Amino acid sequence: MKFKDKLKFYVITDSNYSDEVISVEEALKGGASSIQLRMKTSSTRKMIEVGNKLRKLTSEYDALFFVNDRLDVAQAVNADGIHVGIDDMPISKIKEIAPNLIIGASAYNTDEMKTAEMGGADYLGVGAVYSTNTKLDARNLGLDGLKNISKIASIPIVAIGGINHLNVENVLECGVSGVAVVSAIVGAENILKSAENMNELIKKYIK
């Protein structure tokens, strides 16, 4: 299976909603195919401790494992990849240090998309499609903006931002390779059931 095929159901951790290890295990049971560890305010030691546990779980479920922003942590826990924003370490530098990592890059518009593609990103995290409580400073792109980027991007696109069970089909109709979700899964009362339901919706569009 190509890495692109595992981007379809991409879950991002958020300890404000639930414990990373517990929520990830439930999400994986429910069909999540990629996991991203995002711990913006935690110590490096704590990130590595949690990251090692998530690496074990994702390996058991044959899912991809990404670390947000931190190349050192990604390498320490043997992650499959790293996801970076426009202000994080340049993609070219990451490729120089860790050529085997899958690199995802955030993009809000076509300029950021082109910069990421030229830098050597392997996939794009495009959004925020809708307003989101998990990233209050995110700029809203909307479905039209997502469609425009999807049409011209040369690498896989994972849509992100405010995606839930009620709007995910509208997002998938834009031709993306996958959807990234936070609160709709890790903030759910029943994470397993929520993940199973989301997976069924995604499978209508991406086999």
Curated annotation (Swiss-Prot):
Domain of life, per lineage: Archaea
Enzyme Commission number(s) from the entry: 2.5.1.3
Presence of the UniProt keyword GTP-binding in the record: no
InterPro entries registered for this protein in UniProt: Aldolase_TIM, ThiamineP_synth_sf, ThiamineP_synth_TenI, TMP_synthase
Assigned keywords, A-Z: Magnesium, Metal-binding, Thiamine biosynthesis, Transferase
GO annotation, cellular component aspect: cytoplasm
EC class (word): transferase
GO MF assignments: magnesium ion binding; thiamine-phosphate diphosphorylase activity
Functional pathway: Cofactor biosynthesis; thiamine diphosphate biosynthesis; thiamine phosphate from 4-amino-2-methyl-5-diphosphomethylpyrimidine and 4-methyl-5-(2-phosphoethyl)-thiazole: step 1/1
Pfam families: TMP-TENI
Needed cofactors: Mg(2+)
Residues that hold 4-amino-2-methyl-5-(diphosphooxymethyl)pyrimidine according to the record: Q36, L37, R38, M39, K40, N68, S106, K135
Keyword Isomerase: no
Catalytic activity: 2-[(2R,5Z)-2-carboxy-4-methylthiazol-5(2H)-ylidene]ethyl phosphate + 4-amino-2-methyl-5-(diphosphooxymethyl)pyrimidine + 2 H(+) = thiamine phosphate + CO2 + diphosphate; 2-(2-carboxy-4-methylthiazol-5-yl)ethyl phosphate + 4-amino-2-methyl-5-(diphosphooxymethyl)pyrimidine + 2 H(+) = thiamine phosphate + CO2 + diphosphate; 4-methyl-5-(2-phosphooxyethyl)-thiazole + 4-amino-2-methyl-5-(diphosphooxymethyl)pyrimidine + H(+) = thiamine phosphate + diphosphate
Family per similarity comment: Belongs to the thiamine-phosphate synthase family.
NCBIfam families for the chain: thiE
Function: Condenses 4-methyl-5-(beta-hydroxyethyl)thiazole monophosphate (THZ-P) and 2-methyl-4-amino-5-hydroxymethyl pyrimidine pyrophosphate (HMP-PP) to form thiamine monophosphate (TMP).
PANTHER family, A to Z: THIAMINE BIOSYNTHETIC BIFUNCTIONAL ENZYME, THIAMINE-PHOSPHATE PYROPHOSPHORYLASE
Stated name of the protein: Thiamine-phosphate synthase
Native source species: Methanococcus maripaludis (strain C6 / ATCC BAA-1332)
